Amino acid sequence: MPVLQKRINKDTFGEILERVSSRMSGWREKTLSFAGRLTLTKAVLSSMPVHSMSTILLPQSILNRLDQLSRTFLWGSTAEKKKQHLVKWSKVCSPKKEGGLGVRAAKSMNRALISKVGWRLLQEKNSLWTLVLQKKYHVGEIRDSRWLIPKGSWSSTWRSIAIGLRDVVSHGVGWIPGDGQQIRFWTDRWVSGKPLLELDNGERPTDCDTVVAKDLWIPGRGWDFAKIDPYTTNNTRLELRAVVLDLVTGARDRLSWKFSQDGQFSVRSAYEMLTVDEVPRPNMASFFNCLWKVRVPERVKTFLWLVGNQAVMTEEERHRRHLSASNVCQVCKGGVESMLHVLRDCPAQLGIWVRVVPQRRQQGFFSKSLFEWLYDNLGDRSGCEDIPWSTIFAVIIWWGWKWRCGNIFGENTKCRDRVKFVKEWAVEVYRAHSGNVLVGITQPRVERMIGWVSPCVGWVKVNTDGASRGNPGLASAGGVLRDCTGAWCGGFSLNIGRCSAPQAELWGVYYGLYFAWEKKVPRVELEVDSEVIVGFLKTGISDSHPLSFLVRLCHGFLQKDWLVRIVHVYREANRLADGLANYAFSLSLGFHSFDLVPDAMSSLLREDTLGSTRPRRVRL
């Protein structure tokens, strides 16, 4: 962290601007495409101030200047010659799936970086730097923002950390249950990512600000729904049934970051939280995801991005910006030069499409609106002469625009056979990207017959499964114990309530281990059809993960005095456990054990015992 003895102003961090400006001046001497400037902006300009941004909040004038430098470089402007900024900066800084380019805005990035220091302050309680700050500035609980009100005696470093805590961290703090002594039952975020008061039926408990989770937990029975029911909805109660307190190991309640799937704080998730667009807009995520997946060079993708944002400088767009007196096409003189006219309907481009698009598809191809036309063709992975149609389509659009610009500005763009040229260029591009890009290259698959296999002599196999109708939604789990002959040793179904699919899977594992331990089985082979859950059980999970309380309970059984082997299997080998999980939806809430085979499961048990298999294509 910087040690500053004077008041911060724009001169304090002037060196950052000098470094960025000097780097840009060297690049401007080189001929760079828009895609090249974008790469440098994201990789270098956005990363140069990161160290300073991670330790202190920079003055707003510095942040504005950093954004200005990035903007002017990205669009190719210089002091001598200004260029049109085709898309507004806020759009450029939005995520790619929302139609942006993923460039980081300086102010939001600064706050996201400094908030990471604030998160560490809450997590690293015994670190020396944490102890010093806690003692000097009387750090309190994150729930109480009174200690975060700025004071004149604060240092610039602590003032920055406090702003990160107040404006970022406090909005994303959640809790993972342990012993329930710290979680405020009604006001903390620990179920569904929201306080229970925001999910209740409108009434407010009198002591809601002081009641902790342990106060409403009955050891050996679960939640005290007699006290909870009057203030909660049915959905909330179903979600509570999927959560338990750990009073056995004595694990404490832990902080979790609600804006990431694993509960761990990241600068990326904090930045996304700060820049989320809450204004209702059409969902264009599928369109732009499709656009960025096309196998073409980055310069073609960035042109497609301009097309998707309707920011290409056609005569219609130039006329709208008062840069041209007419919006008529300068090539055919036959109509308004709109985006669709340039890319498809102008005779200069139409001749190429007629020769490339099969006759049977031409009616639909030439009748669609701009976005429908782009989406259907950029997402078309069908082959055309061994090349995906999406690649050929994008290449034709790109070269059509280049040829058009060359014609208007008098450049020599002669090509004897343009259709042959674009096809050959598409083949070259596709082969280059197929050789260098791992994304999309799938491993070969072969068909194999998959079925349940009995355990070795002396072992009992436990198959478990979980199901969620909605993820999160109504959830259940099931499991079965069988010996080396395939005989039924016991089974269970669990109607959980409401939770996610991974949580349901873990409940199945927990009760499978519990069931086997109660039956005093010395050697267990646990089979689960979720690779994620197998990974949690074998390698562990961070304490901030939303499912860590369940993983800890499962590890409690794994550490007992017995042998447990954990194996991942395909669902075709786990059909009986899946059947018991789905059977639980027809039962009342809670755990149901079966010493005898339920009638609905007898056929599945018989098929497994007889060695029935089903085909599945698996990776080599």
Swiss-Prot record:
It comes from the Eukaryota. GO terms for molecular function: metal ion binding; nucleic acid binding; RNA-DNA hybrid ribonuclease activity. Residues 456-586 form the RNase H type-1 domain. It catalyses: Endonucleolytic cleavage to 5'-phosphomonoester. Mg(2+) binds at D465, E505, D529, D578. The keyword Hydrolase applies. Keywords: Endonuclease, Hydrolase, Magnesium, Metal-binding, Nuclease. Binds 1 Mg(2+) ion per subunit. Its EC number is 3.1.26.4. Its cofactor is Mg(2+). It is an enzyme of class 3 (hydrolase). Pfam families: RVT_3, zf-RVT. This is Putative ribonuclease H protein At1g65750. It comes from Arabidopsis thaliana.
